[in-house]
Amino acid sequence: MSRRFGAYEVSRFVDGVYKAPVGHLIHRQGAEALAAALAGHQGETVDMDVNCFALSGPDGIWLIDAGCGTAWGAAYGHARAAMVAAGIQPADVGRVILTHIHGDHALGLIDGDRPYFPNADIAVPEADLGFFSSAEARKTLPPARQGGFDLAARLLDICGPMLRPIPTGRIAEDVEAIAMPGHTPGHTGYLIGNGDERMLLWGDVLHVSDLQVKDPGVGFVYDIDSALAYQTRLEALAEAADHGWLVSGGHLGGFFRVERQGDSFRFVSQPD
C-alpha cells in the first residue's frame, strides 16, 4: 500500500500481527463502559497490525518506525523481507524516525549486536529519549512496564552514534513532528505532505482502531498516562476529520479518512 503526499511516496509494511489479550484494554469510565464497548466482540484477544512506513523522497529512503525485527519471534519481522521485495535494502535507508521507544516500533533497528540499518541516522523524540534514559523515571512504572528503559539502553549501546534527538516542529521538507503524548511522554506523530492532501502517521494514538474510533474512551494498559492519551486521541481524531487528512499508524490496517459521526468518529478506508 502506497500513496504520494507532497515530496514523499508513503508505503506501509506489516511486520506482524499482535494478538493483545482483551484484558489489556481499559476504559476511562470503568469496567461497565469497557464491557459496553466490547459488546459483540468475539474471542479473548484483539488483533492489531504492527506497521512501519517507508518514505521515498528527495533525500532517499526514510522509515517511520522499524517494527520488531526478530526480537519477538517468528510471528514478527516480516517487514524486513517485504522491504527487500519492494527494492529497499537495509543499507539504502538513510534515516529512521521513531514515534516512540517501544519494542514493536524500535527493536527492528537492532540485528543481534549491531544496527540493522547501517547507514541510517535514527531520529528519536527528545522527550522519549530523556524519559526512557532516566533512572528516576524508571521508578515510576511497575517492572512489567519498564521495557522501554531496557530498550533505550540497548539503543544507546548498539546505535548510540546514530541517534539524533529531535524536537517537535518541521523536521524536513513536507514533514512535521507533532507532540502526541500520553502513550509515552514523548510520543510523536508525523504529518506528511502539503496543501490539502496530507497523511498523519500517528503512532500509537489508537491501538484497536475499530473500538477506539467509535469510543475513544477505550485505552490500552501500556499507555503511560491514560488520561493524557485519551485527550490526545480525541484531538487527533478531531483534527484529522476537520482537516481531511488521511491517517495511519502503528496498528491501523491501512490508510483511512476520519469522519465525524455524531459525538464520535468513523474510519473510511482509502485505496492505495
Model-derived segments and spans:
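Active-site metal-binding loops of divalent metal-dependent hydrolases
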Residues: 15-17, 66-69, 101, 127-128, ...
